[in-house]
């Protein structure tokens, strides 16, 4: 028998050696693994129509929750929990682990791409017009407004939407600036203005109010183009933590299936958007490296 085998400490040494040879470092559970195993995902919403909000029954509704449900349900993820916060807290809350992904209409911008990773685009939300029912002046673009000097256009003071109208050539003499959405809509209903410019999402939120009557969305609407010929618009997507690339990639696979089947378009139209708001033919990577767009 060897000296080592006669050593009383030998069994402990042998166990330690074998344990060291066979032990495998424990792998931390990823967000994707947890979501798939628990069949549940938690999303961040800012409780605003049409992005992500609570309906009259207290259930989460809106465009992006509907897309997330449709994307993840085939994987067995059928429970959608939510955390409500201000829009400004969406990215900080995501990074702090308060929820797994955003569903708040967060636009893809180069600045935001430095903090989070995005899914492929799910919507284009550009400018739009609210007009009197029947669109009596046949307004479908800023050019239509510009070409009719009698048209009085309302815009929110300091908004990008009003700035786009001016940039498109609408004379400032035709623009009336208001403090908020409510005052603009009241002016349109009272026929003090002929049209109101605001974002497509704000139009949907406005028209969801059953008390708003006598006005409609100008459809279609031809938006302002940038120097590259693309619509001047916010492009939205779902935001993820930078470490959750596997979750983002899985979500993108499911999102592409929704696009190919036409289900994404149906969700977009059912939410109140139009075909003008379908996602662009650009990737999140391209948008992350593009010049800044409206937020």
Language model segments and positions:
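Ligand-binding clefts/hinges and TM-proximal coupling segments of bilobed small-molecule sensing domains
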Residues: 160-175, 249-295
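A ligand-binding cleft/hinge motif common to bilobed small-molecule-binding domains
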Residues: 89, 105-114, 166-167, 194-230
